[in-house]
Regions:
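Conserved motor-coupling elements within RecA-like helicase/translocase cores
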Residues: 355-373, 389-392
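Proline- and acidic/polar-enriched loop/turn elements at helix boundaries
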Residues: 26-27, 352, 444
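ATP-dependent helicase/translocase motor core
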Residues: 1-322, 331-347, 368, 378, ...
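Conserved helicase motor
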Residues: 330, 351-361, 377-382
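Signature of the SF2 helicase/ATPase Hel1-core->accessory helical subdomain module
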Residues: 165, 201, 210-211, 378-388, ...
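Short beta-strand/turn micro-motifs composed of small residues
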Residues: 192-193, 327, 402, 443
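Hydrophobic positions in the central parallel beta-sheet of the AAA+
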Residues: 325, 373-375, 400
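A generic local structural motif
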Residues: 175-177, 310-312, 357-361, 385-388, ...
């Protein structure tokens, strides 16, 4: 099979998955039905305008020019900075202004409808020629939603012994240099020779290009002959792909450098399962045990926790919940806090850290909705003279996210102390303080079968990704 045959097979899979397929040559500037003014144009403006009018009936049509200008004229010379700015507009809407009678109105135009798949137009285009800084370039397949290119697939022939997926990876690096405007809007890159396929972010190196092994959920792992088919049926499932670009993309600043991180398949499905389990557990009639996510160490637990928080905060069923993130040690608290602080596009709020017991109690007692609060488990210790922890907040939409829950003295049962008084573990104090909160645990090590305390607080596993899965 040569590269053209693989490309056609790939387009067939997109078609079967509900995407429209268009050949780049048929919409080129010099075709009989041009959808581009010239070969430098990246956006399919007719689709973008149709999407704008469909998704923004509250705005005058004149606002479309403002949207087009903001998308076509990024503010920075740095690609990743522009990509981050676009991602923020994608989630929050593009700022527009218009005159209504005598007043100027400030509003937002939305580019994608994340809640209604059928309100969007999904098009896979092959051989879309773009005039680069040195020569014309033709990525194999570009995935457009409402005229915006969200993903690029670069393919190599499975039978060519002199080419492999890393040649495709190198080709993408060249494209980023020569046709960088295409990547301002990018949310995923795929390299494949059909048999092997890897998915990575705009800034990912080879090591961070990872397989995508699932289709509908984490148990749906068909042993397909072509890994590329799994990527197209799973990662590019239209509903899942929208969820992905909305809740599973993070930016981290490391000194001067911005890194874009996207979730792996195990993180994506674990978070989706955990959010559903939490909604059920947090219900006034729920058991308040949202479960335990066990993902082997080194598999990106902090990203999973951050994406879970971002998705949970936006669930209408949670009525703007408060999240309390509990760690066992100060250094963990700091690391995780940094990841969350970097993710404000996703979380839409700034997390706070409780520095002592009094501050923690104040944060929790005053909160009527929303908020992300970090603390260590030790701050639930009793004050002098207290025999039990006072109730701080009785709301049902508080979720306690625990990092490495089972490391601490999480006991619910009383133990007789040396001074003849009964002492409870922190879990009992947390439960007393937040009597209607739901609890979820994230861990990199399995819970022992004898550990009944952890299960009593959190319930059973909601997702497992162990060493075997990670290989």
């Amino acid at each position: 099979m040569n590269e053209t045959q693989l490309e056609n097979l790939c387009l067939d899979w997109f078609l079967e998955n509900g995407w429209e397929v268009v050949h780049g040559i048929d919409i080129a500037p010099d075709s009989s039905n041009p959808l581009r003014k010239d070969y430098k144009q990246i956006l399919i403006e007719a689709d973008l305008q149709a999407g704008f009018e469909r998704l923004n009936p509250h705005l005058p049509v004149s606002c479309f020019e403002q949207v087009l200008q903001k998308l076509n004229q990024p503010e920075s010379l740095d690609l990743v900075t522009n990509n981050r700015a676009f991602h923020r507009m994608l989630l929050e809407g593009v700022p527009v202004t218009y005159k209504k009678q005598d007043d100027w109105v400030h509003d937002h135009a939305f580019l994608v409808d994340f809640n209604h798949v059928h309100q969007n137009r999904f098009v896979a285009v092959n051989q879309f020629t773009i005039l680069g800084t040195k020569q014309p370039r033709r990525p194999d397949i570009i995935c457009f939603i409402n005229g915006i290119p969200f993903a690029v697939l670069e393919l190599k022939s499975p039978t060519d012994e002199n080419a492999d997926i890393w040649d495709a990876f190198n080709q993408l690096q060249t494209y980023k240099e020569e046709i960088s405007d295409l990547f301002v809007f990018n949310e995923a890159l795929v390299v494949s020779d059909g048999v092997t396929a890897r998915v990575g972010s705009l800034t990912a190196n080879q090591e961070r290009f990872l397989p995508w092994r699932t289709i509908k959920n984490e148990d749906d792992k068909p042993a397909l002959e072509w890994e590329l088919e799994t990527v197209i049926r799973g990662f590019f499932d239209r509903e899942l792909f929208l969820d992905y670009i909305r809740f599973f993309v993070l930016f981290e600043t490391d000194g001067e450098k911005t890194i874009k991180k996207i979730a792996g398949y195990h993180q994506f499905h674990a978070v989706r399962e955990a959010v559903q389990a939490t909604i059920a557990a947090a219900n006034p009639n729920g058991d308040k045990k949202a479960g335990v996510v066990w993902h082997t160490q080194g598999s990106g637990k902090s990203i999973s926790m951050c994406c879970y928080a971002g998705k949970l905060l936006q669930q209408p069923a949670m009525h703007n919940p408060t999240l309390l993130i509990v760690t066992d040690r100060n250094d963990l608290d700091g690391q995780l806090f940094e990841t969350f602080s970097n993710a404000q596009e996703l979380l839409k709020q700034t997390p706070v850290q409780a520095n002592n017991r009094d501050e923690l109690r104040k944060f929790l007692a005053e909160r009527e909705s929303g908020g992300i609060i970090f603390t260590t488990v030790q701050k639930f210790a009793l004050l002098e003279g207290e025999s039990e922890h006072p109730l701080l907040n009785g709301r049902h939409n508080i979720v306690v996210m625990s990092d490495e829950a089972h490391r601490s003295q999480y006991g619910l049962k009383a133990k007789l102390g040396n001074d003849g008084t009964y002492k409870f573990g922190y879990a009992k104090h947390m439960r007393d303080a937040l009597k209607n909160a739901a609890f979820i645990g994230f861990t990199g090590t399995p819970i022992s079968s004898e550990d009944k305390d952890t299960r009593a607080v959190f319930g059973d596993y909601v997702s497992i990704y162990d060493i075997q899965d990670a290989v």
